[in-house]
Amino acid sequence: MDITLTIFAQALAFAGLIWIVATKIWPPLLKAIEERQQKIAEGLAAADRSQKDLAQAQEKVNEALKDARTKANEIIDQAHARANQIIEAAKLEAIAEANRQKDLAQAEIDASATRAREELRRQVSSLAVSGAEKLLKREIDATAHKALLDELAAEI
C-alpha cells in the first residue's frame, strides 16, 4: 500500500469519526454539560435565596423576641403595680383595723373610767353620810372635828 492512500484512508476515517462524534456524541454531551451548569446555577441561586430567607427569618425571630420581652416587661410591671396596690390596700385595711381596735379600747377605757367614777361617787356619798352621822352623834369640839376629818380622809 501506498503511504498516500494510507494517509488518505486515515484522514477519511478521522473525518468520519469527527462527523460521528460531532453529530451523535457531542450534542448529548453538550446538553448534559449545560444541564449540569444550569442545575449548579439553580443550586447556587437557591442557596442565595435560602440565605436571604434565613436572614429574614432571623430578623423576624429577633423582632418576635423583642416583642415578647416587651410584653413580658409589661406583664411584670403590671404585676408589680398590682402587688403594690394589694400592699397599699392591706396597709389601709390594717390601719383601719388598728383604729377600730383603738376606738374599741378607748371606749372600754372610758366605760371603765365612768364606772370607777360612779363607784367613787357612791363611796364618797356613803362616807359623807357616815361622817355626818358621826358628827351628829358626837359633841363637836376642835380636836374631835380634826380627828373625824382625818378618819374620813384615811377612808377616802
From Swiss-Prot:
GO cellular component terms, semicolon-separated: plasma membrane; proton-transporting ATP synthase complex
Disulfide bridge map: none
SUPFAM superfamilies associated with the record: F1F0 ATP synthase subunit B, membrane domain (SSF81573)
Protein's UniProt keywords contain Transport: yes
Transmembrane segments: 3-23
Predominant location: membrane
InterPro entries recorded: ATP_synth_B-like_membr_sf, ATP_synth_b/b'su_bac/chlpt, ATP_synth_F0_bsu_bac, ATP_synthase_B_chain
Matches recorded under Gene3D superfamilies: 6.10.250.1580
A GO term for molecular function: proton-transporting ATPase activity, rotational mechanism
Location in or out of the cell: Cell inner membrane
Key words, A-Z: ATP synthesis, Cell inner membrane, Cell membrane, CF(0), Hydrogen ion transport, Ion transport, Membrane, Transmembrane, Transmembrane helix, Transport
Matching CDD domains: ATP-synt_Fo_b
Coiled coil: none
Topology in membrane: Single-pass membrane protein
Subunit structure: F-type ATPases have 2 components, F(1) - the catalytic core - and F(0) - the membrane proton channel. F(1) has five subunits: alpha(3), beta(3), gamma(1), delta(1), epsilon(1). F(0) has three main subunits: a(1), b(2) and c(10-14). The alpha and beta chains form an alternating ring which encloses part of the gamma chain. F(1) is attached to F(0) by a central stalk formed by the gamma and epsilon chains, while a peripheral stalk is formed by the delta and b chains.
Family: Belongs to the ATPase B chain family.
UniProt cross-references to NCBIfam families, sorted A to Z: ATP_synt_b (TIGR01144), PRK05759.1-2 (NF004411)
Function according to Swiss-Prot or TrEMBL: F(1)F(0) ATP synthase produces ATP from ADP in the presence of a proton or sodium gradient. F-type ATPases consist of two structural domains, F(1) containing the extramembraneous catalytic core and F(0) containing the membrane proton channel, linked together by a central stalk and a peripheral stalk. During catalysis, ATP synthesis in the catalytic domain of F(1) is coupled via a rotary mechanism of the central stalk subunits to proton translocation.
Protein name per UniProt: ATP synthase subunit b
Species assigned in the record: Xanthomonas campestris pv. campestris (strain B100)
Protein encoded by which gene: atpF
